[in-house]
UniProtKB/Swiss-Prot annotation:
Disulfide bonds: 40-115
Subunit details: Gamma-delta TR is a heterodimer composed of a gamma and delta chain; disulfide-linked. The gamma-delta TR is associated with the transmembrane signaling CD3 coreceptor proteins following the stoichiometry: a single gamma-delta TR heterodimer associates with one CD3D-CD3E heterodimer, one CD3G-CD3E heterodimer and one CD247 homodimer forming a stable octameric structure. Upon activation, gamma-delta TR complex associates with FCER1G to initiate intracellular signaling.
Subcellular location, principal: membrane
Record-given protein name: Probable non-functional T cell receptor gamma variable 10
Described purpose of this protein according to its UniProt entry: Probable non-functional open reading frame (ORF) of V region of the variable domain of T cell receptor (TR) gamma chain. Non-functional ORF generally cannot participate in the synthesis of a productive T cell receptor (TR) chain due to altered V-(D)-J or switch recombination and/or splicing site (at mRNA level) and/or conserved amino acid change (protein level).
UniProt keyword annotation of Cell membrane present: yes
Subcellular location: Cell membrane
Signal sequence range: 1-19
Keywords: Adaptive immunity, Cell membrane, Disulfide bond, Immunity, Immunoglobulin domain, Membrane, Receptor, Signal, T cell receptor
GO terms under biological process: adaptive immune response
Gene Ontology CC terms: external side of plasma membrane; T cell receptor complex
Residue ranges annotated for the Ig-like domain, each copy included: 24-119
Amino acid sequence: MSLLEAFAFSSWALGLGLSKVEQFQLSISTEVKKSIDIPCKISSTRFETDVIHWYRQKPNQALEHLIYIVSTKSAARRSMGKTSNKVEARKNSQTLTSILTIKSVEKEDMAVYYCAAWD
């Protein structure tokens, strides 16, 4: 199997500047059909109530909202009209991170992935 240069990352924080969002890996490569985790560190005094949103932008396309997660105890919610289980998001209050998982990566998944946080 050939490697797939899958992702480049950036991040931004919205709201009142209460959350600092960081994605440390600039790119991740994986093999086709493998799953991949994309971490996002959220430095916030209100991590438990921050809403974490995940977006992607494919080359020459508009930014697309994928999924968001409100609580470490609840399931993530997909954008309206999206029913695919290809992506999952979760929050970890011990490490103050959100993880976006992309299942069974295909060449079409190559994009820039962003996380954003606000309360």
